[in-house]
Amino acid sequence: MAAVVFDAAILSKQEAIPAQFVWPADEAPAADDGVVEEIAIPVVDLAAFLASGGIGRDVAEACERHGFFQVVNHGVDPALLAEAYRCCDAFYARPLAEKQRARRRPGENHGYASSFTGRFDCKLPWKETMSFNCSAAPGNARMVADYFVDALGEEYRHMGEVYQEYCDVMTRLALDVTEVLAVALGLGRGELRGFFADGDPVMRLNHYPPCRQPHLTLGTGPHRDPTSLTLLHQDDVGGLQVLPDDAAAAAGGWRAVRPRADAFVVNIGDTFAALTNGRHASCLHRAVVNGRVARRSLTFFLNPRLDRVVSPPPALVDAAHPRAFPDFTWREFLEFTQRHYRSDTNTMDAFVAWIKQRNGYESLDKY
């Protein structure tokens, strides 16, 4: 099949989308997916939690069942959020050739990507993304700001400054959220925070252009995030959908997450699920597109340091909960998803099988 260039300015106006973007009928959204049932996920008042250290049982149950909840009273300045969206709009309004100055290279997880057209030739997502690394490690205080100038030019300095501030704020917020999750697991409140304090987060700006045939394609296909934690702010268009459990899957029951301007959606990824020895869930989700308007979202992925070994705290391993995953580093899992495997519904299972084959063992008894 001939290669296709994802130029949002052109494709969003086409009546028929290219075949590479058409998903199989059993994976594509139904024509009436704009009215799917909403999922009820708990809301954590973060300011109240930080003051008291207590959470509701509904939060712990959500982490065990599907790994989704929302946080409010999080301390993120609404003016910073508004400017982050304004810069997102400004970036995606630029000509394709200009955005491609920051083109994502094969095997890398940062840069501009237009629908993965360079990596795959079918079931392409109807989106373009801009991803960049950020770090709280000493010497990296200007990492994001410098990246925008180095990759795109001096005229992007303000944009880089905005996202530097945004990443700094989101790093602090994500570390606070790890305390919520530690309490949900019955651990000491700060027990997981140190694991991520010197980590390698990634920030992503998502743009889903309008599509004349939204029932044939997806903005992001069904997948579990390979990362540890995802903190998502979605605009008022909506499009995030979750498959919360096996019962919903059997009924084909995707559930919509209603946008909430004052909240961040938190979802647990595969790496965090492994860190909890499977006590917390990483569940399937996807993004649908809109037939009339563009959708944008700001996504922050919390990750440990690349060389940090992901291994559960001893308190989470016992006779009733034997080791569910082998030890691995975040670098190993990241490289697996960038070089060997397209993240989907079975990424972690495929990764575990790959580790076992590479290391020459069949069980986890050694752990």
UniProtKB/Swiss-Prot annotation:
Molecular functions (GO terms): 2-oxoglutarate-dependent dioxygenase activity; gibberellin 20-oxidase activity; metal ion binding
InterPro entries in the cross-refs: DIOX_N, IPNS-like_FE2OG_OXY, IPNS-like_sf, Iron_ascorbate_oxido_reductase, Oxoglu/Fe-dep_dioxygenase_dom
Residue ranges annotated for the Fe2OG dioxygenase domain, each copy included: 198-304
Keywords assigned: Dioxygenase, Iron, Metal-binding, Oxidoreductase, Plant defense
Catalytic activity, as annotated: gibberellin A12 + 2 2-oxoglutarate + 3 O2 + H(+) = gibberellin A9 + 2 succinate + 3 CO2 + 2 H2O; gibberellin A53 + 2 2-oxoglutarate + 3 O2 + H(+) = gibberellin A20 + 2 succinate + 3 CO2 + 2 H2O
Cofactor: how and how many bound: Binds 1 Fe(2+) ion per subunit.
A Pfam family annotated for this UniProt entry: 2OG-FeII_Oxy
GO biological process: defense response; flower development; gibberellin biosynthetic process; gibberellin metabolic process; regulation of growth; response to light stimulus; unidimensional cell growth
Entry binding sites for 2-oxoglutarate: 208, 295, 297
EC number from the UniProt entry: 1.14.11.-
Source superkingdom: Eukaryota
Listed PROSITE patterns: FE2OG_OXY
Cited Gene3D superfamilies: B-lactam Antibiotic, Isopenicillin N Synthase, Chain (2.60.120.330)
Needed co-factor(s): Fe(2+); L-ascorbate
Residues that coordinate or bind Fe cation: 223, 225, 285
Family: Belongs to the iron/ascorbate-dependent oxidoreductase family.
Function: Key oxidase enzyme in the biosynthesis of gibberellin. Controls the elongation of the vegetative shoot and plant height by the regulation of active gibberellin levels.
Note: Plants silencing GA20OX3 exhibit a semi-dwarf phenotype, and show enhanced resistance against the fungal pathogen Magnaporthe oryzae and the bacterial pathogen Xanthomonas oryzae pv. oryzae, and increased expression of defense-related genes. Plants over-expressing GA20OX3 exhibit a elongated shoot and internode phenotype, and show enhanced susceptibility against the fungal pathogen Magnaporthe oryzae and the bacterial pathogen Xanthomonas oryzae pv. oryzae, and accumulation of the bioactive gibberellins GA1 and GA4.
Full protein name: Gibberellin 20 oxidase 3
This protein's encoding gene: GA20OX3
